[in-house]
Amino acid sequence: MSGIKRTIKETDPDYEDVSVALPNKRHKAIENSARDAAVQKIETIIKEQFALEMKNKEHEIEVIDQRLIEARRMMDKLRACIVANYYASAGLLKVSEGSKTCDTMVFNHPAIKKFLESPSRSSSPANQRAETPSANHSESDSLSQHNDFLSDKDNNSNMDIEERLSNNMEQRPSRNTGRDTSRITGSHKTEQRNADLTDETSRLFVKKTIVVGNVSKYIPPDKREENDQSTHKWMVYVRGSRREPSINHFVKKVWFFLHPSYKPNDLVEVREPPFHLTRRGWGEFPVRVQVHFKDSQNKRIDIIHNLKLDRTYTGLQTLGAETVVDVELHRHSLGEDCIYPQSSESDISDAPPSLPLTIPAPVKASSPIKQSHEPVPDTSVEKGFPASTEAERHTPFYALPSSLERTPTKMTTSQKVTFCSHGNSAFQPIASSCKIVPQSQVPNPESPGKSFQPITMSCKIVSGSPISTPSPSPLPRTPTSTPVHVKQGTAGSVINNPYVIMDKQPGQVIGATTPSTGSPTNKISTASQVSQGTGSPVPKIHGSSFVTSTVKQEDSLFASMPPLCPIGSHPKVQSPKPITGGLGAFTKVIIKQEPGEAPHVPATGAASQSPLPQYVTVKGGHMIAVSPQKQVITPGEGIAQSAKVQPSKVVGVPVGSALPSTVKQAVAISGGQILVAKASSSVSKAVGPKQVVTQGVAKAIVSGGGGTIVAQPVQTLTKAQVTAAGPQKSGSQGSVMATLQLPATNLANLANLPPGTKLYLTTNSKNPSGKGKLLLIPQGAILRATNNANLQSGSAASGGSGAGGGGGGGGGGGSGSGGGGSTGGGGGTAGGGTQSTAGPGGISQHLTYTSYILKQTPQGTFLVGQPSPQTSGKQLTTGSVVQGTLGVSTSSAQGQQTLKVISGQKTTLFTQAAHGGQASLMKISDSTLKTVPATSQLSKPGTTMLRVAGGVITTATSPAVALSANGPAQQSEGMAPVSSSTVSSVTKTSGQQQVCVSQATVGTCKAATPTVVSATSLVPTPNPISGKATVSGLLKIHSSQSSPQQAVLTIPSQLKPLSVNTSGGVQTILMPVNKVVQSFSTSKPPAILPVAAPTPVVPSSAPAAVAKVKTEPETPGPSCLSQEGQTAVKTEESSELGNYVIKIDHLETIQQLLTAVVKKIPLITAKSEDASCFSAKSVEQYYGWNIGKRRAAEWQRAMTMRKVLQEILEKNPRFHHLTPLKTKHIAHWCRCHGYTPPDPESLRNDGDSIEDVLTQIDSEPECPSSFSSADNLCRKLEDLQQFQKREPENEEEVDILSLSEPVKINIKKEQEEKQEEVKFYLPPTPGSEFIGDVTQKIGITLQPVALHRNVYASVVEDMILKATEQLVNDILRQALAVGYQTASHNRIPKEITVSNIHQAICNIPFLDFLTNKHMGILNEDQ
């Protein structure tokens, strides 16, 4: 615009302003004076009125004062009269009786008598009440209305008695006796009963009033700090009623949930009285106050209190509002939780009489089920216990006092985790000796509503099956209650503190166990109906076993607990033996409390039963011997609501007939933390399967009784876990992967545990979301092989339906016979998991620590091996996972081919059991790519071997000698060992499943071409086990070599004919390995690459057919089983370049070529014409994919780019000197330059460790200083000056004589009138408008360009905008790449710093105009 002169407006702009300004001023002056006048008028009126009112009030006060004086005089007179009257009458009486009997006390007027009297005389109920701990009753009495006071009187006095007692015994935590709910301690039983008659509620509960209120105070502006503009200071308090202001004797702590604007400190915990919270603020909001009671049976309550701030702005403290809540608490829970154990009566025959009672009282659940507790008579049937001695029934509830005294300090933090009475309440006791060690944990300061710390406790025995009752939990949802430390007695009379683990959902009770006395005499034989599954089994209580109890909701029937101890009346079972040794092993159990609703577990009552009867012996040290001598039945978790427990196939199992009784199955868990525990019902959640997860480095040493180690089938108890579990969500609440460091032998030992054992692992992962989580390892995840000579097919059909039970939970890094961590899934059942026996010396003691990841998918829980040390729990791309049961069972009972793959840290461990039963172990190091000669063990006949060699999997089963002919197997980089045999030996034993792994022969392949496809064949059983579905294995192998090839397991469409029906159960193991062609795998759990699919099962109609499935590399679509079509990238003649128009005239370097190519092949594009098969529509869609699909898309894009690039380099001779890049490098380049969005998982690790910061500092480049000296310039200027001085100066004057202007001849021309055509201008975009404005400011006008005749558009502006955009784009992407170089461990840089941008500008040659490179240098010098 500035090229043309601006047109002058008609009026002077300043003049206008002046004319406008004048009236404004006048208006303002008028307004101000009017306002002042109004204010003065108001002031005078107010002053007059105030003066008038003051006079009136003063007069009133004088009148009141006068009357008060008169009233006082009257009162004095009255008092004098009364006193005189009293003494006169008293004197008369005394005189008449005679002076000797005169009692001096009579002359003391009643008003002073209570001060003179000795305190012992005050025995009236009122006085007694006044001296109890809640001494403020008198105040409240006068305040409360009389009728209210009278009705309360009875229960008050009783309550106070109890409180006083409890105060005397502050040190001894205990619970009221819960067996007989009407019974309070013996001494006060009768009074209590009377009180109950008068007041219905007072028998079990006491009403307590809790008042939440707040006071606030206005902060005047002058008192505020500069940076804190809060208007008020407020305090929220929690106190009792006027009658009993102190609440500390029953409130443990209070959580205040403040407004989100107080984050990150919006949850404040106050542990000690007074429960006050003072803060500053500027607004009112509802405060959620969560009161946690000392007794864990009282559910914590939430009180919403609306914070009211001072609206008067006086600056004085004013009361805002108060919220009053009445709470019903358990009588016995008041005070310091103790009552004299005088009422031990006859029940406590085994316990020392001095024990405090720890039998919990029932809990009143605020839920649909109000447990109406009638006094339960002593008929023990009603408690679901066998009719046994009194002692047995009650001893579980008493804790040894010595243990309590030993940990007095812990007592404050570790609240007693108690147990509900087993009347009609939500659970029944599970008997077991437990050692519970309090581990006080700091509660999570973040919102307790979301993440809770686990309760940690240690259990002794690794057996027993947990319960999950969907009935509403009466327990409080305490996140951090830790159990009491109980000292262990001898095995004979072990008495233990019961404990209960509360899930934080009120609607769920996870499980409760109470130890029972260990005396073996209490075993009662059950009727043999147990085995038929018709009646409910009678539970045994045994010192070393957990007895599961399940509860039926809203039903007075109890699902009684099936025995874990021997069932005496079972026809084939030998007699039980007593426990030997003390109970010493010590295992740690962590139960994670998960939010979520209780699922309604289908009531499929069925108990899984181990193929052999087992008997758990706990030897003194760390030994759990499972002897194949006793029958064990445990219920599946799905029985939680069923009243009958039907063991699935107990009948017809020949127990012990073929078995030499000398063989014992032994598991030793030495000092390890193998975890047992109750299953939380959250495991089987239908809503979102939050899994309870895991820790524990379990070091297990296997010592076999009789030298034979036999892994036992461990049943999955989580019935509904698989069937009901929805897709795992990823993200913070997703399936957290736990890294479990397990030596190979441990898995073998774990497998020996009796069915019903729940294994939990606690996570040990680095990322915060994974810490402390628990993962339940379903037993199916541990492959088991049993020593049973007659390998029964159906004996272990888990819980009647394998699909529900272990079937889905299968797949796991468990162990088969040879002992290593076999990755067998086995559908969680003996039939599905390979059964085998190992000969003596069956396990090698070579412990390879492997990390396993427990993968929780909708299909079940998988143990996934994860060798690479740098992978965090979330990104498991590099973890090598080999899953699936690769066992081939032979018909001989002696030996069995079992295949184990243990992926260790960079090593692969092969174990196979030969026919002789010896297990051979061979370790092949994956990272040292030498040729490892296979030892002779590997070429034993009949071995099945799975080899993990640099991302290539070859599975070879050979009949007899074929493998040994193979010689030493070569393992070299990127090549698969070629195996000569493709025949797999298939043995058919009727009634037994076999899985036979056949091998697709593979030539040695280079890394660039698609490699191994290995196929599995399924051999269905001739008589299939009904109801059994097993999970197909997972395979994800990431080679640890330089090229990131991956093998992704896809479940191809060819499997569809196999249809998932549960009539015949066979394991399918599919292992397509694609190196070059990437499969896109979409599966719901995005945290892990492998796709798990529902089990393909061969229908039983063709039982003998061998289905050979050859899996091709394909891309599964969104669903696990359906394929969307094959995207094979053709490397043949078809030109990739034809699809993309890339101008290469101005490009020189490989970087520029890459940039040009990557822009044509975007990973995320909204435009459909740019989209490739792998591109996403938006970043949201891209992040919606799981990590596998994201990686695959990234890889496909890199491959397409590589091909286009290669073609450009080949076709253009001027690029011949450039070396083509590998796909991996291109993928890395795309990621570094921001063409691939970073993984959301890796963005989460917030806090960098100090090492990261240090490496970052170390790796920061020395930034060259932008300062440059001007010496050269100065020197040149001085030279120039010198040069000019040397020139002669001639100044001659010149006269100008005349100026003649040339004459212009103006010729008038007639203007030809031509018709003006209409011109169309396309509207400019906001960006080009901005460019136009900026260019006009510097004096350049950009003219619109004619696109077409009479159509104009702002093309130049658009071009400049695009060019600027590209420039900034290049700089930022280069800066990001620089940031990637400096960031540690291939992390994503948190931010791009100035130094990164400076470095980027210096790195790009054509940006030297932005640097100081050419400053102070003349053009000709360059």
Swiss-Prot record:
State where the protein is found. Answer: Nucleus
- Record keyword Nuclease present: no
Where does the record place the region Histone H3K27cr binding?
259-261, 282-284
What are the boundaries of the region Disordered?
A: 117-198, 465-486, 513-540, 794-842
Where is this protein primarily located?
Answer: nucleus
Per the UniProt record, the associated disease is: Epilepsy, familial adult myoclonic, 4: A form of familial myoclonic epilepsy, a neurologic disorder characterized by cortical hand tremors, myoclonic jerks and occasional generalized or focal seizures with a non-progressive or very slowly progressive disease course. Usually, myoclonic tremor is the presenting symptom, characterized by tremulous finger movements and myoclonic jerks of the limbs increased by action and posture. In a minority of patients, seizures are the presenting symptom. Some patients exhibit mild cognitive impairment. FAME4 inheritance is autosomal dominant.
Official protein name in the record:
YEATS domain-containing protein 2
Give the classification, highest ranks. Answer: Eukaryota, Metazoa, Chordata, Craniata, Vertebrata
Gene name of the encoded protein: YEATS2
